[in-house]
Amino acid sequence: MKWFIIISAFFSIIMIFNSFYSFVFNSVSEIKPNYKSDFNSDSFYNLHAISIDGDKIDFKTFKGKKVLIVNVASECGYTNQYDDLQYLHRKYSNRLVILGFPSNNFGKQEPGSNVNILEFCQSNFGVEFQMFQKTDVIGENSHPVY
């Protein structure tokens, strides 16, 4: 009787796992974007942005490299990502470009000026990767890269 209970419990667990796996797999495989974008990689290289220092940066200078675009904020719970981004920059800078766009769009977590942001990033995280001026990343005024 004891073995019967153990075997029944084992098969019950397998059936529950199988049902859960099937549900998750089928649900995820059916997810499709609900928007259509006219954006393509060629149009990316036609964009530009103003660096945190005030210089115009043409994105065509990034051709031939992988580009990681990330919105950042100094008072965000993910602020320590600057360490990871700087690590990636140092390790892969010959083939990876990191573009940091400070944004105050989410919970007002980037209240400082561009000067404050640059000082914070350099003094606390030694950021050397490309940073841009504070930018909207959502809404009508968002930068075209977003």
Where do the model's predicted regions map?
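N-terminal hydrophobic targeting signals that begin at the initiator methionine
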Residues: 1-2
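Hydrophobic membrane-insertion alpha-helices, especially the h-region
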Residues: 5-19
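Hydrophobic single-pass membrane-insertion segments
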Residues: 16-28
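N-terminal "domain-start" segment that seeds a small globular fold
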Residues: 26-60, 144
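Amphipathic alpha-helical repeat scaffolds
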Residues: 51, 71-75
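Proline/glycine-enriched tight loop/beta-turn segments at coil->beta junctions
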Residues: 62-67
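Structural microenvironment flanking redox-active thiols in thiol-disulfide oxidoreductases
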Residues: 78-143
